């Protein structure tokens, strides 16, 4: 079962006006969810971050967000939403089956599974693998991409575990 927790990230406490309104939209469309906004300060409080996090990774907010989404979904489960998403008519209740104990999201083009909205139960095996691969990639950056470039042209083993 996927917990009804929504996680978003913005590096600062204060949100720009447009981002603030989008954040309010997420909260208004999901009154039955616990919505948590993480900031840089919150991320720094997380224990057991990789050694390279504070020296290399923390300077790049996109990578902080990438790491945080995988960390939260793997350890606690719930739903990650990029804070700039706008819900017009539907809510997550209309697009995600919270009783299904699998990773869910959007699989749009070829073998690409989008990560701007991901739902997962806690301790899911796919999220565990994805989290560890994300840490390897963030730590080694360019060398990781070069060594694993062949996956861009073929089916990655993680794709086979998606419910879609």
Question: Where does each model-flagged region fall?
Answer:
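Glycosyltransferase-associated regions of secretory-pathway enzymes
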Residues: 1-66, 81-164
